[in-house]
Amino acid sequence: MDMKKMAGAAVLAAGLLLGGAGSVWAAHLEDIAARGTLRVGTTGDYRPMSYKDADGKYEGFDTELAVKLADSLHVKVEYVPTTWKTLSADTAAGKFDLALCGITRTFDRERTLAMSDGYLLFGKTILCRKGEEGKYKSLADLDRPEVKVMVNPGGTNEKFAKSRLPHATLLIHEKNAEIPSLIAEGKADIMITETMEARRYVRMNEKLAAPLVDKPFTRSRFGALMAKGDQDFLNYVNFFLAEMETDGTMDALEDTYIK
């Protein structure tokens, strides 16, 4: 085969591959409709975004947002449990259509997966025991060997603690929802968390305080997490989030779960 024919064959093959890939991904929304459910990955341990109530029912800002996303697709929600440690791998493996449970938008996640447009501005802060607020006025006050910092594994809290508090004593606890109570009981000194979670636990537990909640160490937004390659579905989720912002739904959810 001469060079011109080889080049032509290569172009044709590439076109067929691209066309095939496009048709596969274009069918993803159709698959959700045919299945009748939107599979939503959730850790179920992050107040006020996605958590379980006393009866084991999922609640929270992102939980309700997931229901509204499913409603827009005329299907029901099917929650699929995941953990912060396995979140990225489970997303890439296609165990659910998207994850929606208070997931911070990060460059690392965007490089390997797909993240939606951002919503809700927040930042990293701390929870400590009430009465000890005066001990923690800056990162320098936290970054000491005698300060026991507790975080859950695999998420941005652990990453923040390891990168910004290298001299503190780091304690890893598997269940994020248990950490605030452990702080209140004196099992650790501080919890690294986000501003909205800190505010929620301070309201729930009179033994806790969040002295730096109005001066967070970082500024971020949440996003829905999906596997790479499904541009049609990503476009739809981004359109949905924009509409929720425009029609006031985001403000209403914030009033209900965060303020």
Could you tell me what each predicted segment is?
Residues 121-125, 195, 199-242, 258-259:
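Periplasmic-binding protein-like
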Residues 27-28, 156-170, 212, 241-259:
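Ligand-binding clefts/hinges and TM-proximal coupling segments of bilobed small-molecule sensing domains
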Residues 42-43, 115-137, 224-228:
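Hydrophobic/proline-rich hinge and linker segments of small-molecule sensing/allosteric domains
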Residues 85-86, 102-112, 159-163, 182-218:
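A ligand-binding cleft/hinge motif common to bilobed small-molecule-binding domains
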Residues 27-102, 111:
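Extracytoplasmic small-molecule ligand-binding "clamshell" domains
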Residues 38-39, 74-76, 82, 92-101, ...:
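Alpha-to-beta junction loops
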Residues 63, 78-89, 171-185, 220:
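Short helix-initiation/N-cap motifs at beta->coil->alpha
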Residues 29, 130-148:
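Flexible hinge/capping segments at coil-to-helix
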